Amino acid sequence: MRLNSLSPAEGAKHSAKRLGRGIGSGLGKTGGRGHKGQKSRTGGGVRRGFEGGQMPLYRRLPKFGFTSLKSLHVAEIRLNDLAKVDGNEVTLEALKAANIITKNILSVKVILAGKIERALVIKGLRVTKGAKAAIEAVGGSIEE
């Protein structure tokens, strides 16, 4: 078997519709577009969300909330997420390597949620009071 001898399975690919190639093709003359109207013209068609002149849904509904720009580079992580980090030292780079946070995160805060099973050394991360107590209770430490 060679690359040049490969072909798709029988019936796996449909032949393309050849529009406007005579009435015998079944798709001649109007080419499946019907007669007249905006959608039959070249470049015709309405924009996404257009409802025929009626006030569209995206304008009938009120604006709601906003996206904080701070959330794009600040993250909160739970105590049980720390278990996914290899080794016993948790830094910003270690969290990125373990796919717990995305690469654009610049600052992380550890919050008291979930359980921590092993002693870890937290470096360069912010920690809540409750999370700090839980980390120190299992023999871990926090370094600035």
Curated annotation (Swiss-Prot):
UniProt entry tagged with the keyword Isomerase: no
One cellular-component annotation, GO? cytosolic large ribosomal subunit
Cysteine disulfide partners in this protein: none
Keyword Disulfide bond belongs to the record: no
Q: Spans of biased composition, class Gly residues?
A: 21-31
Mind listing the GO molecular function terms for this protein? rRNA binding; structural constituent of ribosome
Which InterPro entries does the annotation name?
Ribosomal_uL15, Ribosomal_uL15/eL18, Ribosomal_uL15/eL18_sf, Ribosomal_uL15_bac-type, Ribosomal_uL15_CS
Keyword field:
Ribonucleoprotein, Ribosomal protein, RNA-binding, rRNA-binding
HAMAP family (alphabetical):
Ribosomal_uL15 (MF_01341)
The protein's job, in short, is: Binds to the 23S rRNA.
State what protein this is by name.
Answer: Large ribosomal subunit protein uL15
The major lineage groups are: Bacteria, Pseudomonadati, Pseudomonadota, Gammaproteobacteria, Pasteurellales
